[in-house]
Amino acid sequence: MAKLRITQIRSGIGGTHNQRATLRTLGLRKINATTVRDDRPEVRGMIRTVTHLVRVEEVDS
């Protein structure tokens, strides 16, 4: 299964509660924090919620 490397590039401060909760659910707490997740529809939906705060790259597993 493909993997996604998700990096937080902007702060969640000033965002909605839902955006901050989504960052926490993805495992992102600080700027430049990176996490690797499976490429699943649920994760893609979370990324869509915070697309302006994160950078997403596909990585080989």
Swiss-Prot record:
Origin: domain of life: Bacteria
One GO cellular component term noted in the UniProt record for this chain: cytosolic large ribosomal subunit
Keyword line: Ribonucleoprotein, Ribosomal protein
Gene Ontology MF term list: structural constituent of ribosome
UniProt keyword ATP-binding present: no
Keyword Ribosomal protein in annotation: yes
Gene3D superfamilies: Ribosomal protein L30, ferredoxin-like fold domain
CDD domains noted in UniProt: Ribosomal_L30
SUPFAM superfamilies per record: Ribosomal protein L30p/L7e (SSF55129)
InterPro entries: Ribo_uL30_ferredoxin-like_sf, Ribosomal_uL30_bac-type, Ribosomal_uL30_ferredoxin-like
BP term (GO), one: translation
Stated family: Belongs to the universal ribosomal protein uL30 family.
Subunit comment: Part of the 50S ribosomal subunit.
Protein known as: Large ribosomal subunit protein uL30
Gene: rpmD
